[in-house]
Amino acid sequence: MERRSALPQDFREVLHCLKMRSKYAVLLVFVVGLVIIEKENNFISRVSDKLKQSPQVLPEANETEASPVQAENGSLASLRQLDTAFSQLRTRLRNVTLQLAGELGIAAPEPRRHVLLMATTRTGSSFVGEFFNQQGNIFYLFEPLWHIERTVTFEPGGANAVGSALVYRDVLQQLLLCDLYILESFISPAPEEHLTAALFRRGSSHSLCEEPVCTPSLKKVFEKYHCKNRRCGPLNITLAAEACRRKQHMALKTVRIRQLEFLQPLAEDPRLDLRIIQLVRDPRAVLVSRMVAFSGKYESWKKWAAEGEAPLQEDEVQRLRGNCESIRLSAELGLRQPRWLRGRYMLVRYEDVARAPLRKALEMYRFAGIHPTPQVEEWIRANTQAPQDSNGIYSTQKNSSEQFEKWRFSIPFKLAQVVQDACEPAMRLFGYKLASSAQELTNRSLSLLEEGPPTRIT
């Protein structure tokens, strides 16, 4: 036992000798610590064997021989003392090692985070998703649930809507765990030997277009969603899954998860450290953007706005109202801070990102518990001051400070009124002001944004 009490002092002397200004010092400390712990383990093991062989409670001179129960209790008590001493030594080793690492300026490794960017179409999610795609230690996936939507058919509303949400959730859970093989059941044509040339928007993920996932390209193999900056062969899903596990963090962007409550099993999964960022945008701006991007689906809206003769179909308005209500209910759930969402939910307005992209990106990284690299800041500066002609409907390059209010000059006031009537509860929750006239709608000096706390973290 004298050896045990003297050991920490000896260990501090060893550490003092090893206190060099180099990152290798920490490694040496761990090695020394492991050696000491192993020796202590052997020492405890030998003492334990002796304790089991002979009783440790000695009889007094006027007593009879100690009973087997007394002997066993004495052995157990001594073992407990040794176990306590060993635990104290291990704790001291950990504390001194962490202290030395701090003095050397070496940050402790970040725990693995799983970031889910949850949005709806035309809310700027592709742009915001790039904040995480540009981070080298994040494995980023762009809309992988697109394949499920194309393969599994669900009618809107009722039990079918719940069924689709459950399928999306279960696939999402496996993807966050780097089980990319689950997509093979939904990709068309089906992958052969885990190879596919049909993964949706592969080129929107740096992780799928860099070595070793990017394999040599093959002649006569057409890949619709090819990598942007280099030629790669068909995606090897096995290599992609391995790359996902090697990366320190995982991030995924989707517009196909509508109800926040369905994500509770993921938030409570001990294998995941989930962070949910819900991105919202003014529904009037969303409608204008969708009428351009999905022109065929909004013919009735455009015809009514231009001619105004035939009434707008009620089911179209109900669909709009349902979308706004779904977004609002999810946000209200997140802001109520149920136990399973505490510290895991962040509400962000696209307009605030557009006005201050770097500041909002850093806030999102802080919320996720990830340290951004300089490449993220460089990308944001380079891609938020893009020239006007670079703004395609799917572009992630934007002159963001000028773009976020452009919709105000391309929507007829009567169309804005329809949106305001259908989405007023959601607009008030998110801080979007209602326009009372066409003049107010197009007056740039009048802001349609409430300036309260634009970003809310729970």
UniProtKB/Swiss-Prot annotation:
Q: Which reaction does it catalyse?
A: chondroitin beta-D-glucuronate + n 3'-phosphoadenylyl sulfate = chondroitin 6'-sulfate + n adenosine 3',5'-bisphosphate + n H(+); 3'-phosphoadenylyl sulfate + keratan = adenosine 3',5'-bisphosphate + keratan 6'-sulfate
Binding of 3'-phosphoadenylyl sulfate: at which residues? 121-127, 281-289
User: Does the keyword Glycoprotein feature in the UniProt annotation?
Assistant: yes
- Where does the protein end up? Golgi apparatus membrane
Keyword vocabulary terms for this entry: Carbohydrate metabolism, Glycoprotein, Golgi apparatus, Membrane, Signal-anchor, Transferase, Transmembrane, Transmembrane helix
Residues passing through the membrane, by range: 24-37
Alphabetical GO CC annotations of the entry are: Golgi membrane
> What PTMs does it carry?
N-glycosylated.
Q: What is its EC number?
A: 2.8.2.17, 2.8.2.21
Membrane topology, as annotated, equals: Single-pass type II membrane protein
Residues on Cytoplasmic side: 1-23
Q: What's a single GO BP term from this record? A: chondroitin sulfate proteoglycan biosynthetic process
Lumenal side of membrane: 38-458
Claim: Glycoprotein is one of the keywords in the record: yes
Q: Which GO terms describe its molecular function?
A: chondroitin 6-sulfotransferase activity; N-acetylglucosamine 6-O-sulfotransferase activity
Glycosylated residues: list them.
Answer: N62, N73, N95, N236, N399, N443
Under InterPro entries, the record lists: Carbohydrate_sulfotransferase (IPR016469), Gal/GlcNAc/GalNAc_ST (IPR051135), P-loop_NTPase (IPR027417), Sulfotransferase_dom (IPR000863)
SUPFAM superfamilies named in the record: P-loop containing nucleoside triphosphate hydrolases
Q: Which Gene3D superfamilies match?
A: P-loop containing nucleotide triphosphate hydrolases
Enzyme class, broadest EC rank: transferase
Which family is annotated? Belongs to the sulfotransferase 1 family. Gal/GlcNAc/GalNAc subfamily.
Q: What does this protein do?
A: Sulfotransferase that utilizes 3'-phospho-5'-adenylyl sulfate (PAPS) as sulfonate donor to catalyze the transfer of sulfate to position 6 of the N-acetylgalactosamine (GalNAc) residue of chondroitin. Chondroitin sulfate constitutes the predominant proteoglycan present in cartilage and is distributed on the surfaces of many cells and extracellular matrices. Catalyzes with a lower efficiency the sulfation of Gal residues of keratan sulfate, another glycosaminoglycan. Can also catalyze the sulfation of the Gal residues in sialyl N-acetyllactosamine (sialyl LacNAc) oligosaccharides.
The name of this protein is: Carbohydrate sulfotransferase 3
What species is this protein from?
A: Gallus gallus
Gene name for this UniProt entry: CHST3
